[in-house]
Swiss-Prot record:
Listed transmembrane segments: none
Gene Ontology cellular-component annotations: cytoplasm
Enzyme Commission number: 6.1.1.4
Residues bound to ATP: 653
UniProt motif ('HIGH' region) ranges: 43-53
Enzymatic class: ligase
Cysteines paired by S-S bonds: none
Highest taxon in the source lineage: Archaea
The species this protein was found in: Thermococcus onnurineus (strain NA1)
Record carries keyword Ligase: yes
Listed name of the protein: Leucine--tRNA ligase
Cross-referenced NCBIfam families: leuS_arch, PRK12300.1
Gene symbol of the encoding locus: leuS
Catalytic activity: tRNA(Leu) + L-leucine + ATP = L-leucyl-tRNA(Leu) + AMP + diphosphate
Family: Belongs to the class-I aminoacyl-tRNA synthetase family.
Length: 967
């Protein structure tokens, strides 16, 4: 067969789908129980979509197609996200001719040079990639209702008015507030950064360090050296301080409110603290070595402790000053032990090695299972030899910190006897009240880079607008909604619960970027994770809005709060519709239709997206729905999918390790791409794109097309007499229908593909082998029937070639709208399946015997099936599952007692092997029916149950496991 022209087939059916508006739902449907509304996070248009995105968008399309074929009225809409700073940042970098950005857009995204320079205007970026994304989605065969398409920001006024309404509603509820809060900040551009504004380090946590002001006397001046710690309770156990002798430190005046102090901190810390409500005036810079060997005073205990050298101290982490608590910190203990062995380092700084030798550890925490110094014991237990054993040290630190926090009891007055997790906060609070300590915010990992290409810092912002996700009552409603939602996979539920717990105020607006101006404070622009939480409701009315816009009958400025309140929050009212018609100029009957559509489609059945959106978008989606909509409109389910890699490597635009979705379609055909990414891993697992494997799959898809095309010419005559192998094929087809259906109902796409494609393909290969040489009506009936079912099973995954094959089969209309197959009760036949499995296994066993025994020129095989009494033993064991019970039951029969010793051994063996599943088949009948086939497969004469016991094998026969002798 000639190579299949996937592109021609795809274009043919995409054109027909668009012309016939196949994927626009029935607008007159009434029974709500047969509606299915599914959405996926709309794509952000800063570049081309890659094959990782392909997974995110193909999953809901496959589910939408499946439900449509099940008879549901399905809504699967799409829109485009352009809000925020990233697109503006890209335009800025292209304007500045940034080489990295130019490389990505010219070489990776293949943007023509004449268009690339237009990207200095953010609107040109949006225009180009919106068109490209739409084309990609159409080329992929996504069954989208394009009549509802829109994009975000004030560039699309109707949606912008919807967002204004959302924010007024939240503000009226007290859920949008103004105040001071820590945010990720781009210090160059001067704007807060949401998750989508981060190019690198999006998931990095913000840590809250307590910085404790140790006191240094220098030239008669009292100077503070603030040591940063996540464990303020351990200040009672400090034995020394650590500084990096090679790092640059500063002496600086630090002003906060009406307080002015002199601090010594790293140069990097001085810069970062200047963003956290402190005015920093650097007096001098110097290397850390200047302070090594000096003493500082612990402000809590009054102890004088020495400053020791430590190159492990990172000046870019917190203050660059570290307090050492070796009894409870494995790193500190090991660093001290290393220093004791490296006296030359101490002598370099005129430190007497005996000073370090004589450092006494201070025990603070009683921990069950450990002695006085848990850190020392954990280090010994894990076999840590030095600071070079980084992995083991990290493990030791994690183990001790976790154990002490959850199970430790504090030993030092006035907190003695209290749990560490309680003491930690008490001490932190007390130290701050006394002015001994302050708070500093720091990233848990670095770097954190904004999409403008700048290193982010943490800034305390005043007069910033926030959505208050920390509101306790709101959290409770979100928990209630989550408890009533279906989450796929269920294992992700705990992550949602955790996010609801820790979510706090979230900056919702910034002063740069594209978006909708905050309606009451328009110098602020609503950011991208805040204008994308309830747009699923807007989809329900957007086709009407779009039509009115196209006809020139819409004034977006008239879409006020009352308009959206009525559509989304009030009961039906003819009077209100007339009032709103007067105000908006929209006919009352259209307003009524909008209201009807919202009430019909809501609640949303499924929200789909990748797992990285759980800590932000997907949880914000729950919060905003429970705030704005009544309980009956709260979402029903969220499906979370995994990520994609390319040839085993994480995809990276900057490194060129990325495959654009559209390029994958061009290379392989949309249906091959769809089937590959759906069949490679379950939707919640990560997948790896391998070009070689995609090529293999393409050949299998072509074989599918070839087989069904051939079977399309057959006539499926009802009432033909079927042989057992025909019944087996129909039974297996039933299993494929059942397996694929269950897989798709549970979003287990890999399982569904295994059943719908691979299982049918493999079973068909076996059936064709078993029926080789036959060309009768029964076989033609089976193959024609199989073709009809198989094409429908494959339609959600490979819609284009399925449509082409459906047409060849003479199917009515589009296969996309055909009835999803259901198991035929008349086809079920477990016994025939067992018999066929029995034949398959026997063939493999005989091949193995010939190979292992190295039998050359084998002529015949003698097959001995299990006698009746062995079947009875197997059935008794399956029923009783106990030696005594089975033996007792069997020995009641005099005939069985004749085989007493053999039965005893057989029961023991079956119980040991846990052979508790047994279903009786007529082994001899199965063998005689398949005798010709077995002989042909093996090239041997097959003799079934002869009188002669060849090689004494007869006694080895067991139920479902015949004895074999080959000569």
């Amino acid at each position: 067969m000639a190579e299949l022209n996937f592109k021609a087939i795809e274009e043919k059916w995409q054109k027909r789908w668009m012309e016939d508006r196949v994927f626009e739902p029935d607008r007159n449907a009434k029974p709500k129980e047969k509606k299915f509304y599914i959405t996926v996070a709309f794509p952000y248009l800063s570049g081309h979509l890659h094959v990782g995105h392909a997974r995110t968008y193909t999953i809901p399309d496959v589910i939408a197609r499946f439900k449509r074929m099940q008879g549901y009225n399905v809504l699967f809409p799409m829109a485009w996200h352009i809000t925020g700073a990233p697109i503006v940042g890209i335009a800025e970098r292209i304007k500045n001719r940034d080489p990295k950005t130019i490389h990505i857009y010219r070489d990776v995204y293949k943007v023509p040079e004449e268009i690339l320079w237009k990207f200095e205007d953010p609107k040109e970026i949006v225009k180009y990639f919106m068109k490209a994304a739409r084309e990609t989605f159409i080329r992929a065969g996504f069954s989208v209702d394009w009549s509802r398409e829109f994009h975000t920001t004030s560039l699309f006024p109707p949606f912008s008015k919807f967002i204004e309404w959302q924010f007024w509603t939240l503000k009226d509820m007290g859920l949008v507030v103004k105040g001071a809060h820590r945010v990720r900040w781009d210090p160059v551009v001067g704007t807060p950064l949401g998750d989508h504004d981060i190019m690198e380090g999006e998931d990095v946590q913000i840590l809250e360090y307590v910085i404790i002001k140790f006191i240094l006397e220098e030239n008669g001046e009292e100077i503070y050296m603030p040591a940063a710690t996540l464990r303020p309770e351990t200040v009672y156990g400090v034995t020394n301080m650590w500084l990096n002798p090679e790092a640059i430190y500063v002496k600086a005046k630090v002003r906060r409110g009406d307080r002015e102090e002199t601090w010594i901190i790293s140069k990097e810390a001085a810069y970062k603290l200047s963003f956290q409500d402190r005015e920093i005036e650097v007096i001098e810079e110097f290397k850390g070595e200047r302070l090594i060997g000096k003493y500082v005073k612990n402000p809590v205990t009054g102890d004088e402790v020495i400053i020791l050298p430590a190159e492990f101290v990172d000046p870019d982490n917190a203050t660059g000053v570290v307090m050492s608590v070796p009894a409870h910190a494995p790193f500190d203990h090991v660093a001290l032990e290393d220093l004791k062995k490296e006296t030359e380092i101490l002598l370099k700084y005129d430190i007497d090695p005996r000073v370090v030798e004589e450092i006494s550890y201070i025990s603070l925490i009683k921990l069950e299972g450990y002695g006085e110094f848990p850190a020392v014991e954990e280090v010994e237990k894990l076999g840590v030899k030095s600071q070079k054993d980084e992995e083991k040290l990290e493990e030791a630190t994690k183990n001790i910190y976790k154990a002490e926090y959850h199970k430790g009891v504090f030993k030092i007055e006035p907190y003695a006897g209290k749990p560490v997790q309680e003491v930690k906060d008490l001490i932190a609070k007390e130290l701050q009240e006394k002015g001994i300590a302050e708070i500093m915010y720091e990233f848990a990992e670095k770097p954190v880079i904004s999409r403008f290409g700048n290193q982010a810092v943490i800034k305390i912002i005043h007069d910033q607008w926030f959505i208050d996700y920390g509101n306790p009552e709101w959290k409770e409603k979100a928990r209630e909604a989550l408890a009533n939602m279906t989450i796929y996979p269920e294992s992700r539920r705990t992550q949602f619960e955790a996010v609801i717990d820790w979510l706090d105020k979230k900056a919702c607006a910034r002063k740069v970027g594209l978006g909708t101006p905050l309606p009451w404070d328009p110098e602020w622009v609503i950011e991208s994770l805040s204008d994308s939480t309830i747009y699923m409701a807007y989809y329900t009315i957007s086709r009407h809005i779009n039509k009115l816009r196209e006809e020139g009958r819409l004034d977006p400025e008239k879409l006020d709060r009352e308009f959206f309140d009525y559509l989304f929050r009030e009961e039906f009212s003819e009077e209100r519709e007339k009032e709103l018609a007067e105000k908006t100029g929209i006919p009352a009957e259209i307003i009524h239709e909008m209201k009807e559509e919202f009430e019909y489609w809501y609640p949303l059945d499924w929200r789909c997206s990748a797992k990285d959106l759980i800590p932000n978008h997907l949880t914000f989606f729950i919060f905003n729905h429970v705030a704005i909509f009544r309980k009956g409109h709260w979402p029903r389910g969220i499906a979370v999918n995994g990520f994609g890699t390319l040839e085993g490597q994480k995809m990276s635009k900057s490194k060129g390790n990325v495959l654009n979705f559209i390029d994958a379609i061009e290379e392989n055909g949309a249906d091959v791409v769809r089937l590959y990414i759906m069949g490679l891993a379950e939707h919640d697992s990560d997948f790896d794109w391998r070009r070689k494997e995609v090529g293999k799959l393409r050949k299998q898809v072509e074989r599918f097309y070839e087989l069904v095309s051939e079977f399309a010419s057959y006539e499926a005559k009802e009432g033909v007499e079927l042989k057992d192998i025909d019944r087996w094929m129909l039974h297996r087809l039933n299993k494929a229908i059942e397996g694929a259906t269950k897989g798709l109902e549970e979003f287990r796409t890999r399982t569904a593909v295994q059943w719908a494609f691979y299982s049918v393909l493999n079973d068909l290969r076996w059936y064709l082998r078993r029926t080789e040489g036959r060309d009768d009506e029964a076989k033609r009936y089976v193959l024609r029937t199989l073709a009809d079912v198989w094409v429908r099973l494959m339609a959600p995954f490979t819609p284009h070639i399925s449509e082409e094959l459906w047409e060849k089969l003479g199917g009515e209309g589009f296969v996309s709208l055909a009835k999803w197959p259901e198991p035929n009760p008349a086809w079920w036949n477990e016994t025939i399946e067992l018999e066929e499995e029995y034949v398959k296994n026997l063939i493999e066993d005989i091949k193995e015997i010939i190979r292992v025994a190295k039998i050359e020129d084998a002529k015949r095989a003698y097959i001995y099936t299990a006698p009746e009494w062995k079947w009875r033993v197997a059935e008794a064991v399956a029923e009783k599952r106990d030696f005594k019970a089975a033996m007792s039951e069997l020995m009641k029969d005099p005939e069985m007692r004749k085989h007493g010793k053999e039965i005893s051994k057989m029961i023991q063996r079956l119980i040991k092997d846990r052979a508790f599943e047994i279903k009786r088949i007529d082994e001899e009948k199965a063998l005689r029916e398949a005798k010709d086939f077995i002989e042909k497969e093996l090239g041997l004469e097959i003799i079934i149950n002869p009188e002669e016991d060849k090689g004494g094998k007869k006694k080895a026969a067991m139920p479902m496991k015949p004895a074999v002798f080959v000569e």
